[in-house]
Design a protein with these regions (language model features):
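Short glycine-rich His-centered loop
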Residues: 83-97
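A short, flexible beta-alpha/helix-coil linker loop
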Residues: 92-95, 173-175, 212, 245-248
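Glycine/tyrosine- and acidic-biased, solvent-exposed loop/turn segments at the edges of beta-strands
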Residues: 1-81
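A generic structural signal for short, well-ordered alpha-helical segments in conserved domains
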Residues: 106-110, 120
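Caspase-like (clan CD) cysteine peptidase catalytic core
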Residues: 120, 129-155, 159-218, 257-259, ...
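Active-site-proximal C-terminal subdomain of hydrolase catalytic domains
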Residues: 102, 123, 203-283
Length: 283
């Protein structure tokens, strides 16, 4: 029928003539599996495709034995599908200085992100440092492997000690700076978990924190009465605070903080670039 059928193999222009790409054709269209190789012979990717490579799944492996997935990409009609994942945390049930709104705030943001096609994990009142670190680490691993956009939102107590910022789980003790450094979770370390691993990844960290000072005068640094310290932003990331560095943010008189209420509304405004969303929130 003069239709192209069979397997097409591409080679590197090298003495070893290692396979670059192998494709399967049916009725003049590329169908089925495509396998690509590194020059060393290690398999780089394996994809399942339909309609001349316009739609399908591409899986990248770390070695030629397909033992460990590096990351995956999804395509539809020739375009990369932007997959989105979010981790939303609300901590309010503190034994020292409980808060009123973080769980409501986290729930509101989670609902807004779901409307924007994010795969959302909502956790509330995370009790310990180990638990909070595990949640963030697991999220970072999943984001790096399967998603192009990562969004982390935190509402609750946070504090700076000597220009290092810490998120505070609900059931730890914070009677001194040493307690904070031991029992809090460093935001700077969190950014290492969340840093973009590929050029096509984008990450957001939103902190509606430093609402009041849970320590009184027990901390030599003044606790979070001085707000949070400025954070260096890694490549491919955007960090947003509910207030300027060095200042505190109110918990809010209603069901939600002023910042989160504004953020939720602006996230759902159609056609607004994400940078403009946060500018609108601050105004």
């Amino acid at each position: 029928d003069d239709l192209y059928q069979g397997i097409q193999t591409f080679y590197y222009d090298s003495p070893e003539r290692e396979i670059n790409t192998e494709r399967t054709w049916l009725n003049d269209t590329i169908q089925g599996k495509e396998i690509s190789f590194y020059k060393s012979g290690n398999i780089k990717s394996e994809g399942e495709w339909v309609n001349n490579l316009e739609s399908g799944i591409q899986t990248f492996y770390k070695d030629s034995k397909f033992n460990e997935i590096d990351y995956t990409k999804f395509f539809e009609n020739g375009n990369l599908i932007e997959r989105r994942i979010a981790l939303v945390i609300g901590n309010e049930n503190y034994e020292q200085s409980p808060l009123n709104n973080p769980v409501n705030d986290a729930t509101l943001i989670a609902e807004s992100l779901k409307e924007l096609d994010f795969d959302v994990t909502l956790v509330t009142n995370v009790a310990t440092e180990d638990e909070l670190e595990d949640i963030i680490y697991d999220f970072g691993e999943k984001r790096n492997r399967d998603y192009e956009v990562g969004f982390v939102y935190y509402a609750g107590h946070a504090i700076q000690i000597e220009n290092e910022n810490y998120l505070l789980p609900t059931k730890e003790e914070y009677d001194s700076d040493r307690d904070v450094e031991k029992n809090g979770v460093s935001i700077q370390n969190i950014m290492k978990f969340l840093e973009a691993q590929r050029e096509d990844q984008l990450n957001f960290l939103v902190l509606d924190a430093c609402r009041n000072n849970p320590f009184g005068n027990r901390s030599r640094s003044g606790g979070n009465s001085n707000g949070l310290a400025k954070i260096s932003t890694p490549s491919g990331s955007l960090i947003a605070f509910s207030t300027d560095p060095g200042l505190t943010a109110p918990d809010g008189d209603g069901d939600n903080s002023l910042y989160t209420n504004s953020l939720s509304k602006n996230l759902l405004e159609p056609g607004i670039p994400i940078e403009q969303v946060f500018k609108n929130v601050y105004t």
